Amino acid sequence: DRLADQAILDLARADVEFIDVGKKPGFPTPQEMINTLLVHLGSQGLNVVRLKGGDPYVFGRGGEEAQALIDAEVPFDVVPGISSAVGVPAAAGIPVTHRNVSVGFTVVTGHREKGGATSINWEALAQVGGTIVVLMGVSERAEIATRLMSGGLASDTPVAAIRYGTRPEQTTIRTTLGELADAPLESPSTIVIGQVAAFDFSPTAGTSAWARKAGHASLD
């Protein structure tokens, strides 16, 4: 996965073979190819790790890969992860829920389906309330903002976009829904929309304990 930090890959044994099947904007690795590769290698009795960022079953196509392995009768295991939908905002000091502010959150993908259509009813989502976390939505942020405002969300609704969340190079851009289209966002970024996006409960020392243990100097 393209979101796997190199520091994690460096922990592998020297004789491990790395196969890059990351999905980059404009240069995606076809999911069918990934499924076939997993089945092919797994059928040989090899120890295959499909390393992903976040949780494999939250917009990670993990279910499709699991189904392919089941159909081919290749045994597998799943190690749950912390979804970037909650882990990345937390690393930026943003709680996706907060008493008297947001009693729930919705996680959606901003990625379009084949053919250019989107299956998300953004206008209806604007009426749900709570926090909206958008994954893979950088390139579609203009339409997302327009449709959410058409659905009733105020243009001054706080928005935070966190790039490379939990990593040393993490950056956070704070803006509003009305200005989201012109914000200098880059992929990969997790977009948080709602009143909680105005919060900044970052560690008071500037670096969280787990980051210090990992040898990271700062998350700023």
Question: Where are each of the predicted segments found?
Answer:
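Residues at the C-termini of beta-strands that transition into short coil/loop
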Residues: 22, 80-82, 100, 111, ...
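A contiguous loop/helix-start segment that scaffolds small-molecule binding in enzyme catalytic cores
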Residues: 3, 33, 44-49, 61, ...
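Short alpha-helices
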Residues: 83-87, 192
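Class I S-adenosyl-L-methionine
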Residues: 1-82, 179-186, 219
